[in-house]
Regions:
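Face-selective signature of the C-terminal outer-membrane beta-barrel domain
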Residues: 45, 80-97, 109-244, 298, ...
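Surface-exposed extracellular loop regions of Gram-negative outer-membrane beta-barrel proteins
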Residues: 139, 185, 228-230, 234, ...
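Outer-membrane beta-barrel translocator domains and adjoining extracellular loop/strand segments
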Residues: 56-63, 96, 101-108, 134, ...
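Transmembrane beta-strands of outer-membrane beta-barrel pores
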Residues: 21-25, 39-41, 50-54, 95-99, ...
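Periplasmic-side early beta-strands and strand-to-turn transitions of outer-membrane beta-barrels
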Residues: 5, 12-15, 22, 34-110
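Gram-negative outer-membrane beta-barrel transporters
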Residues: 211-218, 298-299, 306-314, 332-387
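Hydrophobic, lipid-facing positions within transmembrane beta-strands of outer-membrane proteins
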Residues: 2, 15-17, 29-33, 73-77, ...
Length: 387
């Protein structure tokens, strides 16, 4: 189990304070507090949490019968400043630390650092602009308690800059354009000699949301992606339509999917618990797909019914396959494959507060002659929930 605190809403109170604690078996202790203030143009919210749990054994014969204890610190701060009625500035920062106890003189340590700045400017009721920068770093290290050495063997550092602009025509048509830049640095024990690699990615996109009538909605978009390490440039279009007839909504869409190989998929050389080796492949191609879908949704009073059908054509899917040279699992591009499926849902909500939902999913992967199946996806899935 875990606790996630997401700071999303500004407080209207001048001051607020929340303190909490929890105790459970295995000496599991959690202490936390949140303090915030709202003073004129400033709004601040600070959250601190500490968690500690002892090592304990579980009734599970075999190699994995012990759950190691740990201690965790988590700090978060968000500060909002309104210098103008039309301008909002947001800053945030966070720090995460976890130390896991295990036998011997070495402890596992995990650290996370995050921060960001964002500006939202409203030109008028028709247009607004958002620009921002975020920083994220996640480290793993081995703490040698006898020598008091903290040896870092994994570090992922990301710098991201983004911009987003919206303009509304005639109060009902919206144009959205934006761009992102990401610098991704990764040093890992999963690379040969703890090597490091850096990749730069950039994208630019545009989308137009057109509403010619109250019944018809059309969304068209185009996205350009660039990845430095694999030197890939790619355009991805998207087109979607919705038409309303009474209580029924009909939808259809086409989109082109795209995914460039990650640094791990290209450069990993990793011994998986002495069971097998996993190797990256710097010659991987980008994974692409063409995705088609149609759906119908009917809503009346407290009842809702929807059905969706889709067909995806996937090219160069990135997966691991067994290799004799080098011996182990290696990332590779698999053969072209097609995937089709149907999703159906029925739900209802009654005045007494009771509701239910029935869902059914069917997936079929079209395999060509001699093609290996790399996934164990269940063709039929059904769920029933009552709340």
């Amino acid at each position: 189990g875990g606790v996630i605190n997401i700071i999303t809403r500004e407080s209207d109170d001048p001051w607020n304070l929340n303190l909490n604690s929890r105790f459970s078996e295995h000496n599991d202790q959690r202490y936390g507090g949140t303090v915030g203030f709202n003073a004129g143009k400033f709004n601040s919210l600070t959250n601190v949490q500490y968690n500690n749990v002892d090592t304990y054994a579980v009734d599970n014969p075999g190699d994995f019968s012990t759950v190691f204890g740990s201690r965790v610190w988590n700090f978060k701060e968000r500060l909002i400043y309104h210098p103008l009625e039309t301008l909002k500035l947001t800053g945030r920062a966070g720090y995460y630390f976890r130390e896991r106890n295990k036998p011997g003189d070495t402890q596992d340590r995990y650290r996370g650092f995050s921060g960001g700045m964002k500006a939202n400017y409203t030109f008028n009721i028709m247009s607004n602009l958002e620009v921002g920068y975020t920083f994220d770093q996640y480290d793993k290290s081995d703490y040698q308690s006898l020598y008091k050495n903290d040896v870092r063997d994994y570090s992922n550092v990301q710098h991201n800059v983004h911009a987003l602009y919206n303009y509304t025509f005639n109060g009902k048509h919206t144009l959205t354009v934006g761009a992102d830049y990401l610098r991704d640095y990764l040093m890992s024990y999963q690379f040969t000699d703890n090597a490091d690699h850096t990749m730069h990615t950039a994208d630019a996109f545009g989308q137009f949301d057109w509403n010619p009538t109250e019944r018809l909605n059309v969304i068209a978009g185009l996205r350009f992606d660039y990845f430095s390490d694999s030197n890939v440039r790619h355009l991805s279009p998207h087109l979607g339509m919705m038409y309303k007839i009474g209580n029924c909504s009909l939808r259809g869409s086409y989109s082109q999917g795209f995914r460039s190989p990650t640094l791990k998929e290209m450069y990993m050389v990793f011994n998986m618990a002495n069971m097998m080796m996993i190797y990256g492949n710097p010659d991987l191609k980008s994974e692409t797909s063409h995705n088609f879908s149609v759906s119908a949704e009917y809503t009346k009073n407290r009842y809702n019914f929807s059905v969706t059908g889709y067909y995806n054509l996937v090219h160069n899917r990135i997966n691991t396959v067994y290799s004799e040279d080098p011996k182990g699992q290696i990332y590779t591009n698999t053969d072209k494959m097609d995937i089709a499926g149907i999703d159906a849902n029925i739900s209802a909500k009654y005045p007494c507060g009771l509701g239910y939902r029935l869902s059914y999913t069917y997936i079929h992967e079209f395999m060509h002659d001699g093609q290996k199946k790399f996934t164990d996806t269940r063709p039929h899935t059904a769920t029933v929930s009552v709340d």
